[in-house]
Every structure is written in structure tokens, then in C-alpha cells.
């Protein structure tokens, strides 16, 4: 007599293998999705900093890029102090990615009319913003702001991590 189907053991083995492969695929997809969100947030914030500097140079006046609600993770606003409409642009973020800045750039970055970042009291400013990975992961995206106003997007493990709870 010829066999027409599969045995119970063959079916259970195939289902177990399918479940295992699905689990690996879902984990990889989740990690890839998180990495893409972090990369997009880093690029958007670096571009906003460059736009703020360019706007300050173009208008020859102070322009501020300020974190929404005091947290870069929720987005940022481009502001002009000497304009009828102080809000020039608003960038939204959904808070999916945690962004932390060191003390000088924790909540805002102000550019002079010459494109130089300034602290309160008009002292030169430099700092870095870190795009945080998920807890337990390394932070690999960092935006550095130099004293001259140059904005650079770096990829790699920072020397002094700013993100709480992450391993570096």
C-alpha cells in the first residue's frame, strides 16, 4: 500500500521548524526597524541643525533650534527672536527614538548671525547629541556640533555615552 500523506511526526517537525524560522525573522526585522528609526532621527536632527545655522547666516541674526517640551525625542522648533513670527519651522518626532544631548545642547542650540553656536552670555558652544538605542544596545549614532558651527553625523560607539541604561 502506497503512503498518501505525511505522518504526524513529519507535520510537527515542519511546524516547529516554521515557528523557529518565523521567530528569527521577526527578531531581525525588529532590530532592523529600530536601526532605521535611529538613523532617520539622526539624519533629520543633523539636517535641522544645519538648516538653523544656514538660516542664521542668511538672516544675519540669532536663530535657535529648541527641543519640543525640553526633549529632543519629541521634535524641535526653529525660532527667530527678532521676527514678527518667531516660529520659522517645526519638526515633529513621535518619541519612538530617545535623543539625549550633553549639558550645552541638552535643550537648545543658538546660532549667531555668523553661524557660530553660542551659549547664554555669548560664549562659544560645542556639544553632542546621542541617538539612543533600545535598552541593552549600544548607541551608535551621534551628532557633534563644533565651536565653529560645523555639524557632523558620526556612527560608532561613543567614548562617553549619554543614554541611560545602554551598554557601551
Annotate each PLM feature:
Residues 1-29:
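N-terminal single-pass transmembrane signal-anchor helix
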Residues 24-54, 58, 62, 66-168:
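N-terminal helix-rich module
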Amino acid at each position: 500500500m502506497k503512503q498518501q500523506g505525511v505522518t504526524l511526526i513529519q507535520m510537527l517537525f515542519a511546524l516547529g521548524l516554521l515557528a523557529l524560522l518565523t521567530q528569527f525573522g521577526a527578531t531581525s526585522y525588529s532590530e532592523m526597524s529600530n536601526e532605521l528609526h535611529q538613523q532617520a532621527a539622526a539624519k533629520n536632527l543633523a539636517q535641522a541643525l544645519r538648516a538653523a545655522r544656514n538660516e542664521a547666516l542668511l538672516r544675519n541674526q540669532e536663530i535657535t533650534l529648541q527641543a519640543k517640551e525640553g526633549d529632543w525625542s519629541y521634535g524641535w522648533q526653529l525660532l527667530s527672536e527678532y521676527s514678527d513670527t518667531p516660529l520659522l519651522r517645526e519638526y515633529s518626532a513621535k518619541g519612538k527614538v530617545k535623543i539625549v544631548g550633553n549639558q550645552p545642547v541638552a535643550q537648545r542650540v543658538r546660532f549667531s548671525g555668523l553661524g557660530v553656536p553660542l551659549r547664554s552670555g555669548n560664549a562659544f558652544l560645542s556639544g553632542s547629541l546621542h541617538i539612543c538605542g533600545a535598552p541593552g544596545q549600544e548607541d551608535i549614532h551621534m551628532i557633534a556640533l563644533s565651536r565653529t558651527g560645523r555639524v557632523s553625523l558620526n556612527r560608532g560607539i561613543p567614548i562617553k555615552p549619554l543614554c541611560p541604561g545602554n551598554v557601551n
